[in-house]
């Protein structure tokens, strides 16, 4: 059975690109258009991995991450920070506990390697 990955991304084109890449790598992908939807989907049926854009309106990726980690049903799910603000956010994301960081634009090989590493680690 393939791992389930929840993508939280407000830009349709970015979300579609992630979905296509991950689906082509045989992952089951669920999509959230905003932070609230991400929390709802994660709590209803916890995925194996969550990829969250840090710069979403209303409820940004930072707050989504805090809420996921505060909830016992989602606290152990690895989360990948995804953002275009690489210089500013990389250190902060890893410091607060994100499992990994992917900058935009991302390299497909790096993205897939990061996902594979975290999904494999989660399955152990």
Which stretches of residues belong to each language-model region?
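Conserved acidic carboxylate
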Residues: 9
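C-terminal output helix
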Residues: 106-116
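Charged docking surfaces used in two-component/phosphorelay signaling
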Residues: 16-24
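Receiver (REC) domain active-site loop signature in two-component systems and cognate sites
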Residues: 56
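Active-site beta3 strand of CheY-like receiver
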Residues: 45-51
């Amino acid at each position: 059975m393939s791992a389930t990955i929840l993508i939280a991304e407000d830009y349709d084109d970015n979300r579609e690109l992630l979905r296509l890449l991950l689906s082509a790598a045989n992952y089951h992908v669920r999509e959230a258009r905003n932070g609230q939807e991400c929390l709802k989907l994660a709590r209803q049926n916890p995925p194996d991995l969550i990829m969250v854009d840090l710069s979403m309106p209303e409820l940004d990726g930072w707050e989504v991450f805090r809420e996921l980690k505060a909830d016992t049903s989602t606290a152990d799910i690895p989360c990948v920070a995804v953002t275009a603000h690489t210089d500013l956010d990389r250190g902060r994301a890893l410091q607060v506990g994100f499992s990994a960081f992917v900058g935009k634009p991302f390299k497909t090989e790096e993205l897939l390697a990061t996902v594979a590493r975290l999904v494999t680690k989660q399955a152990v």
